[in-house]
């Protein structure tokens, strides 16, 4: 071992060891495991001689038990981690695209205790060899020779097995200055010893793992098997003369009857229960010569205190009632002396155990002897006691170090967590001596196509659809939801008569206004609960269908608050929501009567908070209807206003879905055909109204297609801004879309590179190329890179003008003063819309504000720039 007597010599040794460790860090797992095996075998072969040296040098402990500890440190630790990977790639998750690569921390400085010198050295050397770290050990001055012998034994075995020379060494002549320099110079400090030494390790300025003193309280419950408990405690507390820091320090017996049984059992198992006079004698000895008692046998301690005990006495039991720093029996005693307390109740016993840990040894170890069936009492103890090792019906000395009588990992360094001022809350393992590098490969977000289980379309399909759905779902009670206008004008009568012919009992709910509110949904839920249907049928435009979706979801998930449901999300799979996972109980069929939002096919809904007047855009997969019916016969009598507004809303959703970051080949078809249908047929339907049934069918299809595209891609800026504009200034949603769409299209093309989206996990798609493909699909010709976009933009503007939508907000009579007063709040709500994030070009809040101003003033608006 290194003859280091000066700081300079220590510094030179550390430099040598770092070079050796760099070589060691290149070793393969096979080479490392071979060295570990050799070290463990050498330690086992020399376990007896090392134990003899430890007892002789320290004058502490019991030879046979030290032999066992040496054997344990080598055999149990080697076996536990024999197949544990510590080199190269140690873990791979192909699904997540994650690799974990192990790297050694470098040079470890180990501070060793006088209580377990050789076994602690073997344990820490094995862990460092397993993790390809170099280790420089600093022994306790009273155990330096036996520690150096243990280190030399392990080092020679490691070198013979191929380890680089110099990766294991020991300071043969320890001194405080050298130990402090060591702690300040290594990459990681492993400190085992007294509280002062552990605190010094944490104050060194280097990463440290400390294993400090304990003060293990053990509760004996009335339901415990007293004989088994006492036999276990005696064997644990007398092991190596009580030198293990995890050994029992105080027994708390619950109830006077239990205390008497405990005393009798201790006497049977070679314990001596001290009377009050003997307790005073021993208390005085602890006050004056506690250090001399460490690791001594019970008979020696009794004789030193002037107490007569039988020769076979293994353990001294001192009765006490006080828990304080002035009571020596309430503190840690590294010798076969145990304190006995009486608690009147289990709750008092818990209080006493907490006080003992707070006094000394918080975070270390605690024990409980109890009937395993007393689950409530065990749970209460588990929750209240602040200890990292909670042992039930187990000897704490052997149980805490692991693998002997518990499933804990084998260790001779026991972390106490933050309760004990340690960064380690558990037993020291190889993983704590590794720097694990995580390699994360880029992943594409898994996408799914969400649409109703069945979509019925073509004119006159309603009857056939409902009959087919009845055969599948066998429904007998229908909650029929529509708006007041449709019910009053008897638009729903044909469907209700059909339900009557099918023999279905139904109730009609139509207490809805054009702007759906939270209060209306809550009233509808009350009606749902009263009728308890087999099926919900929603018929109408966006308001009625959104109401049906929200009522069903809130009826089946009453635990979900509106605040949670409307909360914004970045990823719909990771949203923060308190909903319990359960299967939907009630099918929902939607029948569209307008060609606009495509609500019949989407898991989206808009509801207004009547208190603030702000609309909430809600998205949830469980809002998706079970089946959708798109029957153009229900749309024959749409007036011009609903026709143009629905058409422009459809065009906006389809176009933005095609450009969305979440667009895929699956959704492109929906979006492209929807755009083409609107551009080709909206004007015909608008001009000829009921006369052009073919155009009506195309618009009905376009609306549903746009809805399915939007449900899976999330439309972007225009939809977000239109929702806010409609809410603040009471413009129809389609009108808002018609005003905003051309302006936002131009903005996006101009700022594609400047305003990048945050969702980098989606493949880049050139906005200009997408517009070119869209223009070509809609028959707007080919040309230069910008020409197709210009043609598409011109087509949208011309369509807007021909269906008589004004190009500015101001043209609709919105007062300038009111618009400017509400602009900032409206801008914030629009930008905060959940769909804004999925736009290919996400405008900032200031840009959204400017876009609103351009759309209010039109071409006359000029941006005010600072001089």
What do these predicted ranges mean?
Residues 25, 307-446:
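Conserved C-terminal structural/oligomerization subdomain of aldehyde/semialdehyde dehydrogenase
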Residues 89-228:
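Rossmann-like NAD(P) dinucleotide-binding subdomain of oxidoreductase/dehydrogenase enzymes
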Residues 728, 735-821, 861-862:
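Gly/Pro-rich interdomain helix-loop hinge
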Residues 1-99, 127, 268:
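N-terminal Rossmann-like NAD(P)+-binding subdomain of aldehyde/semialdehyde dehydrogenases
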Residues 601-713:
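Carboxylate- and glycine-rich phosphate/diphosphate-binding segment that chelates Mg2+/Mn2+
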Residues 447-535, 809-810:
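ATP/NTP phosphate-donor binding region
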Residues 85, 150-151, 519-633:
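Glycine/threonine-rich beta-strand-loop-alpha-helix active-site module
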Residues 4-6, 122, 198-324, 351:
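ALDH superfamily catalytic-core signature
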């Amino acid at each position: 071992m290194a003859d280091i007597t000066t700081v300079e010599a220590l510094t030179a040794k550390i430099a040598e060891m770092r070079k050796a460790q760099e070589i060691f860090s290149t070793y393969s797992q096979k080479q490392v495991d071979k060295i570990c095996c050799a070290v463990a075998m050498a330690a086992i072969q020399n376990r007896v001689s090392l134990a003899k040296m430890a007892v002789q040098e320290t004058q502490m402990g019991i030879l046979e038990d030290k032999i066992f500890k040496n054997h344990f440190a080598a055999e149990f630790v080697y076996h536990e981690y024999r197949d544990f990977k510590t080199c190269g790639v140690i873990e791979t998750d192909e699904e997540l695209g994650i690799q974990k690569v192990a790297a050694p921390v470098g040079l470890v400085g180990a501070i060793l205790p006088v209580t377990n010198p050789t076994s602690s050295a073997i344990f820490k050397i094995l862990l460092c060899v397993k993790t390809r770290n170099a280790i420089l050990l600093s022994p306790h001055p009273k155990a330096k020779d036996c520690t150096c012998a243990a280190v030399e034994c392990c080092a020679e075995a490691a070198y013979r097995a191929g380890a680089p020379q110099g990766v294991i060494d020991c300071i043969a002549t320890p001194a405080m200055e050298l130990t402090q320099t060591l702690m300040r110079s290594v990459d990681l400090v492993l400190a085992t010893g007294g509280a002062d030494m552990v605190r010094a390790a944490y104050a060194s300025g280097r990463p440290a793992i400390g294993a400090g003193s304990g003060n293990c309280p053990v509760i004996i419950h009335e339901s415990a098997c007293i004989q088994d408990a006492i036999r276990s405690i005696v064997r644990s507390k007398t092991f190596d003369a009580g030198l293990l820091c995890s050994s029992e320090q105080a027994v708390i017996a619950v109830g006077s009857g239990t205390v008497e049984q405990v005393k009798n059992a201790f006497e049977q198992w070679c314990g001596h229960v001290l009377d009050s006079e003997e307790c005073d004698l021993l208390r005085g000895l602890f006050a004056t010569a506690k250090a001399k008692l460490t690791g001594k046998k019970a008979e020696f301690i009794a004789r030193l205190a002037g107490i007569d005990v039988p020769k076979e006495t293994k353990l001294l039991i001192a009765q006490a009632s006080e828990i304080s720093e002035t009571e020596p029996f309430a503190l840690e005693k590294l010798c076969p002396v145990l304190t006995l307390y009486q608690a009147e109740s289990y709750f008092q016993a818990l209080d006493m155990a907490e006080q003992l840990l707070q006094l000394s040894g918080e975070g270390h170890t605690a024990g409980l002897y109890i009937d395993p069936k007393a689950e409530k009492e065990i749970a209460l103890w588990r929750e209240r006691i602040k200890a990292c090792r909670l042992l039930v019906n187990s000897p704490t000395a052997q149980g805490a170090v692991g693998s002997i009588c518990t499933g804990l990992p084998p260790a001779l360094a026991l972390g106490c967590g933050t309760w004990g001022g340690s960064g380690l809350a558990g037993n020291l393992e190889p993983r704590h001596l590794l720097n694990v590098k995580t390699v994360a490969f880029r992943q594409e977000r898994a996408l799914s196509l969400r649409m109703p289980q069945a979509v019925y379309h073509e004119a006159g399909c309603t009857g056939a659809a409902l009959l087919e759905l009845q055969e599948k779902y066998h429904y007998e009670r229908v909650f029929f939801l529509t708006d007041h206008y449709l019910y009053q004008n008897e638009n729903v009568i044909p469907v209700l008569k059909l339900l009557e012919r099918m023999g279905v009992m139904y109730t009609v709910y139509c207490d809805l206004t054009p702007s759906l509110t939270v209060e209306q949904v809550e009233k509808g839920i009350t009606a749902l609960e009263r009728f308890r249907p087999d099926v919900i049928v929603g018929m109408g435009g966006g308001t009625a269908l959104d109401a049906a979706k929200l009522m069903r979801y809130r009826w089946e998930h009453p635990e979900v608050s509106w605040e949670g449901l409307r909360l914004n999300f970045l990823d719909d799979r990771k949203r923060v929501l308190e909903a319990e996972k359960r299967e939907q109980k009630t099918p929902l069929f939607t029948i569209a009567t307008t060609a606009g939002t495509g609500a019949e096919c989407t898991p989206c809904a808009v509801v207004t908070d009547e208190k603030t007047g702000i609309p909430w855009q809600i998205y949830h997969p469980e809002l998706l209807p079970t089946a959708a019916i798109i029957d153009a016969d229900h749309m024959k009598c749409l007036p011009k206003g609903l026709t143009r507004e629905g058409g422009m809303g459809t065009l906006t959703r389809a176009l933005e879905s095609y450009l969305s970051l979440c667009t895929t080949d699956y959704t492109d078809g929906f979006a492209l055909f929807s755009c083409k249908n609107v551009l080709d047929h909206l004007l015909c339907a608008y001009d000829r109204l009921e006369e052009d049934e073919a155009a009506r069918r195309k618009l009905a299809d376009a609306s549903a297609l746009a809805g399915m595209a939007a449900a899976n891609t999330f439309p972007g800026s225009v939809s977000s801004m239109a929702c806010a504009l409609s809410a603040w200034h009471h413009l129809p949603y389609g009108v808002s879309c018609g005003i905003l769409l051309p302006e936002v299209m131009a903005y996006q093309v101009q700022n594609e590179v400047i305003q990048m989206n945050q969702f980098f996990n989606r493949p880049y798609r050139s906005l200009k190329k997408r517009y070119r493909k869209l223009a070509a699909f809609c028959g707007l010709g080919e040309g230069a890179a910008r020409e197709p976009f210009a043609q598409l933009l011109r087509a949208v503007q011309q369509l807007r003008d021909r269906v008589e939508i004004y190009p500015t907000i101001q043209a609709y009579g919105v007062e300038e003063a009111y618009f400017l007063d509400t602009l900032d709040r409206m801008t914030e709500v629009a930008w905060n819309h959940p769909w804004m994030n999925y736009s290919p070009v996400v405008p900032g809040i200031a840009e959204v504000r400017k876009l609103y101003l351009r759309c209010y003033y039109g071409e006359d608006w000029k941006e005010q720039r600072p001089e």
